[in-house]
Every structure is written in C-alpha cells, then in structure tokens.
Amino acid sequence: MIDNKSYLISHPGSTLGSFVIPEDLSISDSMSLVECLLQYCKSKNIDNIRVTTPPNLYQYRLSNYIDFAFLKNNFYYLKRDVTSILYLENTIDETLKKFRPSHKRAIKKGIKKGLTCRLNTDIKSFYKILEQNLNIRHGVTPTHTLEELIELFKIFPEKIKLFSSFYKGEMVAGVVNFVVNEHVVLAFYISHNQEYNDLSPLNLLFFSMFEWAIKSNYKIYDFGIFTVDGVPNMGLGRFKENFGASGIFRDTFEIAL
C-alpha cells in the first residue's frame, strides 16, 4: 500500500523487472500482454501499476514494443533515470583506449602503490566498508542486510561476483556485480574505504573487472544509475564517463486504474 492505495510493482525490492518475453515478440503480442496485465489488475482491485523496465541494451534483440504498448495503454513515465553503459571491446587494451587520462594515471598510481585486485568471497569485509560509506555519504543503510547478501551469494554463486581492491592485505574497495545475462554485467554495490582515497582503489578495480568481463565474453558493463528521481549526481556521472561510459534510460512506467 502507498498512500492507502494498492500497487502492483515489479518488484519494489529489485533494480528492475518486467515481462519475460521471447526475442521475436510481435507488436500485436506486446499490446496483448499489457492489456492482459491491466485486466488482471482490475480484476484484483489493484489501484496502480508500476514497472521499471530493463535498459534496451539488456535485450538480445533491441525492441521498444513493450514501452510502446505501455504508452498506448495510458501508462506514463513516472521517472526516467540514466544508467551508465560501457561497451567492452575485444581486448582490455582496446577498452583502455576509451579511458580518459585522469583514470589511466589513477590506475598506474594504484599499481605503483601496491594495490592488488581479485575476485573473492569476503562479503563481511566488503559489507563493513559499504555500511560505513553509505552512512557517511547518504545517512542510509544497504538495500540488503549482511545475512541476505551472504544468502544471495550462496544461491547464485555464478550470477553474483565480488571483486575487491587490497592494500597491504586489507580490503579497501569492492564492487558486487550481478551477471544479468550472457552479455551484460551490472554493478550493484560500489564502495570504498575513504581513508584510502589517495590510492584511487576503484579505478584499478574497475580496470581489473573489465579485464575479467572481456575474458568471460561479456559485451556490456552497466555501472548503474547516477540519477535519483531524475536528478543527476554530476560527480558520479563524470567518474563513470571517464571510463568511456555513456548514458541510457532506465524507465519506470506507472498507471492509475
């Protein structure tokens, strides 16, 4: 319930979600799907529907049919956030060419200072960094509890990957990645220990993750959104752009029934 009204939301605890559809979905079937959704919700006395669709580039075959069907059935854009997408080239050297000089320098500095990066399962150490960072920067707690995150890693060991930067044996930064499908990896949690800002640990960490992603045949790295309800965090957006990323929409549709 939101403001005493019932909502169908796909899903309120997830980054995004919509219909699970075949690659060759037709415009006719797209319209029918949305119409069936509306009929079902009305039959259950649901007041509102809210859907956050995956970015188009997650699809194997690009299509805006579902978006079109939503709009034709009087859904509206509740918000249009922007997520940062990096196309991964065939080699890490080719991908590195997209980096701006500041990020290249930061990577070299991290290596010179003795930073190392690796795939690991030390979720507790990462969570401590994440909690501290979110509290300092935003006064909030992580979406998942530590226990929930540990359980997710157990259930989906091939779909959730933690990469971390280490300095003198201590974890100083980490990124929890969700493997979305065969060609897309999404950064879900990004955090670092601010006491080690001078090492720029995230720069070398992302470089290492891109190298892993390329070797694993992924084609797109999604850094996640840098907007909150349409308001951009310019510093965060610039940080991602310096890796060669560009922005695409992550849309949320809504309708009142």
Which sequence ranges carry the predicted segments?
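A conserved beta-strand-loop-helix scaffold within acyl/acetyltransferase catalytic domains
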Residues: 1-6, 53-196, 212, 229, ...
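A gly/proline- and charged-residue-enriched helix-loop-helix capping module
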Residues: 11-60
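Gly/Ser/Thr-rich helix-start
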Residues: 18, 140, 225
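Residue-level detector of anion-binding/catalytic polar loops
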Residues: 47, 76, 116, 219, ...
